[in-house]
UniProtKB/Swiss-Prot annotation:
It is an enzyme of class 3 (hydrolase). The active site is at R149, E157, R197. This is Probable endonuclease lcl3. The gene is lcl3. Residues 1-41 are annotated as: Disordered. Signal peptide: none annotated. The keyword Mitochondrion applies. Residues 15-36 have a biased composition (Low complexity).
Length: 295
């Protein structure tokens, strides 16, 4: 039967149909090429970004608050919470301006000791936070303490460097050890000396003193008990001001008048020496012995 009905048989016979072999011989159609990406200019990319969002108040205000908070934390840490491991590391801006707070770890002589700097004190967690404990062993404290020289006084010398002990040196050392050991003190630093110590006016609060917990000047307490003399060196004397020097000399005069401590019997004893005179005599003897050894 013809299909469509109006078509002739001759037309259908004249129209060839592609055979299977011809279809196999036809080359495959190539895939369509992808459209190339247009080259974007960097300036166009930057300009296309919406920078206006960074100028809105909802962005500026939180950014300013966060930046101010970070800078404030850094400033507070550098000014109030930075720990000084030794006297050399104390910033010069502290001298005659600020103080350091710490716990006394050892007393070397009648007028000097070592403290472990605890910036911020108990408010910063020292003494009650697990990671802010003051070390107790000598190994842990090595190179971690500030060597402090009491300002304005000179105590009798203990035996060291081959020199004998000065009279009343042991009593002064024992009193200072009992008065300061393991206690928290505040030291108003004045300067560094030639022995890598800081000369400081030191204050302590004690419950057993009367009135209790009143701030005590350690140098003044030693002078009024006759445990030290006013510092008499020609250079390097530090008192914390002319008013403190007058206060110290008045305390020394009263101790001398009452014959307390090292002033006991000093008027009748012709061989009595002050700590400064003792150091001067020992220095001259060392020089004489040195010349004799060379000759």
């Amino acid at each position: 039967m013809r299909w469509p009905p109006w078509g002739s048989e001759s037309q259908q016979a004249d129209t060839p149909s592609p055979s299977t072999e011809q279809q196999a011989q036809q080359p495959p159609t190539a895939p369509a090429a992808r459209p190339s990406r247009p080259n974007k200019d960097w300036n166009q990319s930057v300009n296309a970004f919406d920078w206006a969002a960074f100028t809105e108040l909802r962005t500026i205000i939180p950014t300013a608050i966060l930046t101010t908070a970070i800078l404030g934390i850094v400033h507070i840490h550098r000014r109030y919470l930075r720990r000084f491991p030794d006297a050399v590391s104390i910033a010069p801006s502290y001298f005659r301006q600020r103080s350091i707070l710490g716990q006394v770890t050892s007393v070397g002589d009648g007028d000097n000791f070592r403290l472990f700097h605890t910036p911020g004190g108990r408010l910063a967690g020292w003494g009650w936070l697990p990671w802010k404990k003051v070390p107790t062993s000598k190994k842990e404290l090595r190179d971690k303490t500030v060597h402090v020289r009491l300002a304005g006084i000179d105590a009798p010398e203990l035996a060291h460097f081959g020199r004998p002990a000065q009279p009343f040196a042991r009593e002064a050392h024992q009193w200072l050890t009992a008065y300061l050991m393991t206690r928290r003190v505040r030291a108003y630093v004045h300067r560094q000396d030639q022995y890598q110590r800081v000369v400081a006016s030191v204050y302590v609060r004690r419950a057993l003193d009367f009135p209790p917990f009143r701030r005590r000047d350690v140098s003044y307490e030693m002078l009024r008990r006759g445990l030290a003399t006013v510092y008499e060196a020609k250079a390097g004397a530090e008192f914390g001001g002319p008013g403190m020097e007058r206060k110290y000399r008045r305390a020394e005069w009263w101790a001398k008048f009452r014959g307390l401590g090292l002033w006991k019997g000093f008027r009748r004893n012709k061989e009595w020496e002050s700590p400064r005179e003792f150091k001067t005599r020992m220095g001259l003897e060392d020089q004489t012995q040195g010349r004799e050894n060379k000759s």
